[in-house]
Amino acid sequence: MSKESNLSEYRPIRVALLGAGSVGSEVARLLLEQKSELAARVGAELELVGVAVRDLKTKRNGFPKELLTTDAESLILSADIVIEVMGGLQPAKDYILLALNSGSDVITANKALLATHGSELF
């Protein structure tokens, strides 16, 4: 049985994105546009379940509006993987702690957060 035929046997991996700036926009674009390629590499479908933003009124190109939310906590609790690309120390730290404590895997490149609170988080 090929890897792709096995994909339908498993539920999608739910991905939450925290932040919709330059990096977040590109991550979302890749998750949405490269769905098949990513599924073949990962062995499961990656489903972008939402993008947490601070302000829904800010104009954002490339995001389906139904994915945007200001309720980061609910989004985090619905995800298997949380990708934090908001930057800064807060609320990023609290969101990562919530994700880790709820059993989600976390991806971040937030150097300031890792330098300041890395030992507490991981």
Kindly give the residue locations of the regions a language model identified.
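Rossmann-fold NAD(P)-binding glycine/threonine-rich loop
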Residues: 92-102, 111-122
